[in-house]
UniProtKB/Swiss-Prot annotation:
Source taxonomy: Eukaryota, Fungi, Dikarya, Ascomycota, Pezizomycotina
Gene symbol of the encoding locus: cex1
GO process terms (BP): citrate transport; export across plasma membrane
Keyword Aminoacyl-tRNA synthetase: no
GO MF annotation terms: citrate transmembrane transporter activity
UniProt KW keywords: Cell membrane, Glycoprotein, Membrane, Transmembrane, Transmembrane helix, Transport
GO cellular component: plasma membrane
The keyword Transmembrane helix is annotated on this UniProt entry: yes
Role description: Transmembrane transporter that exports citrate across the cell membrane.
Membrane-spanning segments: 60-80, 95-115, 125-145, 155-175, 186-206, 215-235, 296-316, 332-352, 395-415, 417-437, 459-479, 481-501
Record's protein name: Citrate exporter 1
Organism the protein comes from: Aspergillus niger (strain ATCC 1015 / CBS 113.46 / FGSC A1144 / LSHB Ac4 / NCTC 3858a / NRRL 328 / USDA 3528.7)
Amino acid sequence: MSSTTSSSRSDLEKVPVPQVTPRDSDSDKGSLSPEPSTLEAQSSEKPPHHIFTRSRKLQMVCIVSLAAIFSPLSSNIYFPALDDVSKSLNISMSLATLTITVYMIVQGLAPSFWGSMSDATGRRPVFIGTFIVYLVANIALAESKNYGELMAFRALQAAGSAATISIGAGVIGDITNSEERGSLVGIFGGVRMLGQGIGPVFGGIFTQYLGYRSIFWFLTIAGGVSLLSILVLLPETLRPIAGNGTVKLNGIHKPFIYTITGQTGVVEGAQPEAKKTKTSWKSVFAPLTFLVEKDVFITLFFGSIVYTVWSMVTSSTTDLFSEVYGLSSLDIGLTFLGNGFGCMSGSYLVGYLMDYNHRLTEREYCEKHGYPAGTRVNLKSHPDFPIEVARMRNTWWVIAIFIVTVALYGVSLRTHLAVPIILQYFIAFCSTGLFTINSALVIDLYPGASASATAVNNLMRCLLGAGGVAIVQPILDALKPDYTFLLLAGITLVMTPLLYVEDRWGPGWRHARERRLKAKANGN
């Protein structure tokens, strides 16, 4: 028990008693902001958000990130094989590309079901179930004999792999506060996006030397290893089941390692802080109601526009590079390294910048409200904290670079191969950086349903992205690369004012929603 108490104290937020009188301007800060004189009392009464140490949280983030690799990996590893699939099954390149579109559609739809289920039944059961679906799909793909089977099992593959992103985000939402969430979401995105870098390289190697079917056997083996790590090491984190880590886990919610080591930090008689929700068809579709919230819709829609443009760049790479530069499957796979490294570095860097920006916004908030320097602030303790401002400080320079590089990408195909690869790096860096900001903000807006919120995010991205991938080839045929990517840059530029709208009016919309939900919960 003593070790548990020590761990709890180390994680407990320490908020000092203010020794200064709040400024007159504090009078207009609203009822959502706690009085400074009550901060110490609040912190002494509240248990830590989660008892896991920083290193333990990092370990769990790595496990769920490696699991989430399989959603982008299963899509991107397939890109260099498109030409071989077309020839092997005697179909056109457009039909081969359609298998990517189908994958992305299901990739968008499936997490809405799995995410809400994991918010109700737990993260581990859904993780395990979806991975079993994924492994079965890969075995079937490796043995598929015709185009119909390939399409059907690609859809099943997407249904199994896509949920790993929303469930992984749910795990992060369960164990983190807003002030530490940015860097962990960045790590989650960076490790996950490793699939963007290594996927096409592996796909090119397998296709060149072993045939495209070997891709699916590789995914079966790698997916099995990831499933094993979840079974052995990942505990249940859903707060209505596991609480803040002090509730004893049993059955499927208990990782195999606890059978050997025991579960540390358990408090006798500890109960979850929230009630477990029931799974129903209503709960499955409930996350779609998030889209009627103005701040959520704007955040998701703009992120989806960027995702669509990025998807159109990557999905057209195989055909463009093969036609313009005459590259083989292996060489095309290697050209995706720029895109992959851009994804990883963008997610890592922007994730850590978000934590820095959170601290910067904390200081500004404390100065405005008369709190002492060093006061830790998050949405749970201070609901009026401007999380939108904290998350979106990096957005402006990131989107500016994204628009410029997309506009130049089509023209770059007339130059040396290195130029479009470098531009792909910056396009991927900026797009993934924006996804990281987008993902963290969505979790902040719905912290109690982070998996469902992430699933809706994934739904909008993938449906718009699938539409973009489906039409990119006809647009390229009609406008040629120069004007195609200039058009995409222009569309992004036109949508950019949405960022100002979210920054300016988002906090007010969030406060109104919180008051409405609180009144509904109280039966008013």
